[in-house]
């Protein structure tokens, strides 16, 4: 526990030292922020005054002409969606084997909802007791 606290304090102290290097004076603050951005890949948000002084020209709303590749890809997308909706409506006929598998999976879903001790109790009810006489069938022999 002491080691973790010591490590955290050391990390905070090193972080403060790095920040103090970048904020040494008012004149070098802009340069240091640029260097810090380049070195650390961090985004700084501009102050309110800088945001108000920025001129943003109003752009006219002009629709870009659709390229031929965009039109083709849009048609392909529409065709795929239509195929998917048609295939979703088709009913599939299940074979006997797939019905058996689905029934088995539905039965197993019930067991996934119960806890382990309940499962063991339920399983114990269905187990056959094994005795040597029932396991090894033998016929009485005459001597």
Curated annotation (Swiss-Prot):
Q: Which residues form the signal peptide?
A: 1-15
Where is it localised? Secreted
Keyword list (alphabetical) reads: Milk protein, Secreted, Signal
Does this UniProt record's set of keywords contain Repeat? no
- What main location does UniProt list? secreted
Pfam families from the xrefs? Answer: Casein
Could you give one GO CC term from the UniProt record?
extracellular region
Tissue distribution is: Mammary gland specific. Secreted in milk.
**Physiological role:** Important role in the capacity of milk to transport calcium phosphate.
| UniProt similarity note | Belongs to the alpha-casein family.
Q: What name goes with this protein? A: Alpha-S2-casein-like B
| Organism for this UniProt entry | Mus musculus (Mouse)
From the broadest rank down, the organism's phylogenetic lineage runs:
Eukaryota, Metazoa, Chordata, Craniata, Vertebrata
- Write the gene name: Csn1s2b
């Amino acid at each position: 526990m002491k080691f973790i606290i010591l490590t955290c304090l050391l990390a905070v102290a090193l972080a403060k030292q790095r920040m103090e290097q970048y904020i040494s004076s008012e004149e070098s603050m802009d340069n240091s922020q640029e260097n810090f951005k380049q070195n650390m890949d961090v985004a700084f948000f501009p102050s309110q005054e800088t945001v108000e002084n920025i001129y943003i020209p109003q752009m006219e709303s002009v629709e870009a002409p659709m390229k031929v590749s965009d039109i083709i890809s849009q048609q392909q997308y529409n065709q795929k969606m239509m195929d998917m909706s048609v295939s979703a409506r088709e009913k599939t006929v299940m074979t006997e084997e797939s019905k058996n598998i689905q029934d088995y999976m539905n039965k197993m879903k019930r067991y996934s909802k119960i806890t382990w001790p309940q499962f063991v109790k339920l399983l114990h009810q269905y187990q056959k007791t094994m005795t040597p006489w029932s396991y090894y069938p033998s016929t009485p022999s005459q001597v």
